[in-house]
Amino acid sequence: MGKLLLFDCDGTLLHTYDLIAETFRQTFELCLPNQTFTEKDIRSYFGPTINDTFRFLSNSEEKYEELMSTYRKINLELHPSYIHAYPNVKSTLSFLKSRGYDIAIVSNKMKHVIRYGLELTGLSDLIECIIGSDTVDVPKPDPMGIRMAMKHYNMNQAMMIGDSIIDLQAAKRAKIPFVGVTWAHVTKQEFQDEGADYVIDDMVELLGILGE
């Protein structure tokens, strides 16, 4: 395997669950005040792009645009108060970079929002290439983002690290190994049932998989 590591962002590098959940709550209160959304409803909107989520919830183009603009405004305002890196993420990425690994992000989040989160958490200097939802024509689980990152580095091999089944499916379609992380929402058993190559409970365990 080449020394290219592709990470999802939310739920993998950055703890953003509370940020995203609160953004959804405030957006729904403002834009859909007559509808009720449970915590289970909100959890179901994690993973798909917000474009897909708000298309599903909208009954008009006007409502869709209102949801999108409101969500983006609130999300950026809440970033400094809610976002942080998971334990051992920064130290592990720093070590891997010192060992010659190229580190990229392939996410279903917009590129400028990813960059903002990396800056707030001190990770931006460790990651050169960011593939976001606005970089590709089709988001994960389509493998387009993975292939774009591999092309950027002129590599035909890589490894994907992510917290969702969508990440796993994208890696499978791109025919690269996948490492599932358990500190977000998907359990070790769920990843194994879906055919993950590896599953880790702490980012530092990635070093063992890589022989470092």
Give short role names for the model-derived ranges.
Residues T27-C31, E39-I42, D52, M68-I74, ...:
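Sparse, context-dependent recognition of short Cys/His-centered cofactor- or disulfide-binding micro-motifs
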Residues M1-K3, S94-K97, K111, R115-E212:
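Asp-based, Mg2+/Mn2+-dependent phosphohydrolase catalytic module
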Residues G2-K90, R99:
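N-terminal helical cap/lid subdomain that shapes the substrate entry/recognition surface
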Residues A85, V106, V138:
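Residue-level marker of regulatory loop/turn positions in helix-turn-helix DNA-binding domains and
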